[in-house]
């Protein structure tokens, strides 16, 4: 076995050169390697490397794995034809790939002695040639979709992983046999439908109850949690690699399980969590609580959703949707090269060809250019197809989303998202705002630079006064949270009174009562949040929300008045007194049941504002007087922009999305004066 000390003695001149296996055309050809057999794990690694067209492809297995430490401390010997004989030249590998190849070699040669044909990015792409890498990454979708099989290598067997793999294989196969194949197109991840079809059969209920028990125990003992917390599940490139091939398997140590079995049990966990009736049928004294399933489900279910979209062409996700799903309001997947936040998703995006984005790793292209090109391509594509909400990507750009500083290290324009994992979700849920009125199509204005986005729209007003940021802070379990909530609404009442004193505001509100209702309507963006099946959805508020608000604010005002009582209560809670715990549970039930808290939580970090003409609303936390509230053609919510001194009257920084009371249904769309806005 070649160790790091041996590798260090090999001179650069004696190492494998990619020139010896040059690609005739890196846009149409790939390299493959045949891994040679060996008698035991510690035998040196040998292979031969050759080229092949990607179409039609030969038979090969594509590997999905994690590089780990990129230092190449190990080696594989590559066959080299010399004078009609054969010599072997070393090619350096990372430690993780060395371990992987030794396991795969042993797994393969337990069944047959033929060489194992593989595609592995670390070996088959010249990683030192950025131009070749750019062409080969463009082929990534074809490489993985054309493979005979994709092997997901999770790593050696540790942390009780053999038990997890055995359970997934055994219970997963039995699930497919007794309940049905949820991956068939007519079912497509519809385990709940398959269960409902079989639930009247006693043997099916018996099996499901036992399957629930097995999954429950793996989660309770954290074996499954440790399995899904392996590094492979946290990387971005692995999502694409996992989704593209029909035959995909997980390998962990010397255990192998089909993705289909893991998928079935993953969706079964979702059904248990979401379906109270099913839980009631399957629960036993051995499975007292379903909450233990959450950690495993949250890591796996999105992965299989992406795979489901990918396997059926008419369900393909757009690049915009993928970026939002993976980088907004969640812990984002990891990448080594930041431009792979885009390039690593192109193989999954159904609109990748239409967008015209081509991977480019050359030093002449900057990260800012990659992100700017991506945002502009998405906006222009949506404009072409007259898609409603075609400017939605602007919600994730803006200086309001830059949590570290207004200027970032990539020097992005203000309207381009960083996709850095600190992006907050848009406050808008699934509902019918339409601030742009009937002008559903983005109206792009030509500009002199790709970094400037020109949009046509109208100005609502200029901000003249501000309230405090919304901080829903009850989770700190101190009276400070209640004080902040009460203080926020006291300050907003001040803005409301100023609006009512503004004569121009009389044109905004149909009645005094409607104006008064802005007190509870504006802070939650006129949205009542409810829980749907597996997600949160929203509807427009109505008069019932007034009652919910009165209960909400009265509760927190009571906390503020009883500060000392609250401190005593929290001391009792922390000491574990049952009555205190019960009281906290009832408190949470009350807060959540009426929905006002959830609406306010979706506006977390936003700041109330008042315009010179009496409009009230919520905008990014870094607002300042002089900022403008605007609506762009083709978008259904307003934004806040900031004039750029010395750049002309129409040049602005995009500060972020906003809510503006009295315009969200297009009240100004027909009468407001049109302007051109240039975002830089």
Swiss-Prot record:
Pfam families reported for this sequence: HET (PF06985)
Protein name, UniProt field: Heterokaryon incompatibility protein 6, OR allele
Top-level taxon of the source organism: Eukaryota
Function statement: Involved in the non-self-recognition during asexual growth of N.crassa. This process involves restriction of heterokaryon formation via genetic differences at 11 het loci, including mating type.
Naturally occurring in which organism (per UniProt): Neurospora crassa (strain ATCC 24698 / 74-OR23-1A / CBS 708.71 / DSM 1257 / FGSC 987)
Gene name as annotated: het-6
